[in-house]
Amino acid sequence: MKDKKNYIDHIPKINDMKWDVSEDGIVEITVENTGFYNTIAQKIFKKPRYSFIKLDEYGSFVWQKIDGKKSIYEIGKELQAVHEGAATQLYERLSQYFAILERNKYIIFEE
């Protein structure tokens, strides 16, 4: 039988992305819009080459804790210690958040 690893035991690592932290602690991720359809949209509809994704307070805190060493569980414990309001359904929300980050290729998981 295969040994299944719990999702919150995964260790996230930030993919090769440019990102900055503003003075108020909010993370802004810079995403280049590449590909055939994006190129057409940029030329015809004057769409920008780069998109700037601003994370909220919790998302910014979590993003800055991703170091390729801590598991989702450990990051959740740190979030819970700093933000008392984050305790409600913490790991369900974190699991969804990390799934979205992975789907958009902002992060990868270390093996």
Predicted segment positions?
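Alpha-helical membrane-targeting segments
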Residues: 29, 33-52
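Hydrophobic packing positions characteristic
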Residues: 1-36
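Long, charge-rich, low-complexity alpha-helical segments
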Residues: 2-10, 44-111
